[in-house]
Regions:
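Nucleotide-sugar donor-binding catalytic core of glycosyltransferases
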Residues: 1-105, 119, 123-167
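A short acidic, often aromatic-flanked loop/helix-cap motif at beta-alpha or helix-coil junctions
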Residues: 109-114
Length: 167
């Protein structure tokens, strides 16, 4: 993934990449294959590709369908984000921490259309920061919070000592 991410393009177009095992969640996934089978803006692959081909296909798409499998989380969700692409998945409370990430959440997969993808691109393309997915972002955030906590402690200790010294 690291090698492919270095050459990943971060431009968004209304194209969708689909690649997953139907058998992992047959009830939902079979319907999805049928839903997008004849859409010219959706590319469907079966999961027998090499890892390199699979990752390159993600790299060449803008949106990656990441339906629930054995659980609500999917490696596809995180691979898409890591490669600078937008995963599409259904709302679930476990994703509340992902609200600031470039993710297209739907209530039902039947909502997905080329128009929805175009609207997402137009309305949200500049409202997300891809930087939040980098190690440097989290390093800086933790370092800042650590420094802020030290400052807060020193201020509280000084105020406490000033209060105690009054008596």
């Amino acid at each position: 993934i690291t090698e492919v991410s270095k050459i990943s393009k971060n431009t968004l177009e209304s194209n969708l990449y689909i690649n997953f095992k139907i058998s992992t969640n047959y009830k939902e996934r079979e319907i999805l294959y049928k839903q997008f089978l004849n859409e010219d803006w959706a590319k469907i692959d079966f999961p027998n590709l090499s890892v390199t081909d699979y990752l390159n296909n993600i790299k060449n798409a803008s949106f990656i369908l990441a339906p629930w499998g054995n659980g609500v989380d999917s490696h596809r969700f995180w691979e898409a984000l890591y490669l600078g692409k937008v995963p599409i998945t259904k709302h679930h409370h476990t994703y509340k921490t992902a609200k600031h990430l470039p993710v297209l959440f739907v209530n039902d997969y039947s909502e997905i259309s080329k128009e929805i993808l175009n609207n997402f691109i137009e309305n949200f393309k500049d409202s997300y920061s891809w930087e939040v997915l980098s190690i440097q972002y989290w390093h800086d955030l933790i370092k800042k919070d650590y420094k802020d906590s030290e400052t807060t402690y020193v201020i509280k200790e000084s105020l406490f000592n000033a209060y105690v010294n009054k008596f």
